[in-house]
Amino acid sequence: AGLAIADWPLVIAADHSWYFKPDAGQLLGSPANEDATEPQDVQPEELDIALGMHRIEAATTLAVRPTRTWAGLRSFAPDGGLVGGWDPEAPGFFWLAGQGGYGIQTAPAMGAGCAALIQGRPLPDELARHGLTPALLSPARLRVAPR
């Protein structure tokens, strides 16, 4: 018999070396790798699949058997934080980037927050209550002052 996983939380290793979460009636797992690569149509690497399976199985009682595999490009800001806001030097350009390996988890909140910022409204109360501010998301925080 299968496990009742629908209500399981996102589970992530303390060192961020793997994670899994319920998704569409199955578990979505990842080795949480951050390999630098040029933009391209990335494909799942057999080594990454095996590494993710090994890490999850070593830390849990799960026996991982993939039914599908996929890969994707992820963007990371230099400070590791999410980026959402108007570019201070490119009028009309709005950044929504830096979701790294957390895009699946952060997309609903980032979508709501960035929609508000684009429309010139304050961040939704449920985001502001948790301390999120436009300044924390702003791409301006990443600008390096000229020397």
Predicted regions and their residues:
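Active-site lid/adjacent beta-loop-alpha segment flanking the redox-cofactor pocket in flavoenzymes
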Residues: G2-G92
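C-terminal lid/capping helical subdomain adjacent to the catalytic/cofactor pocket in oxidative enzymes
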Residues: E89-R147
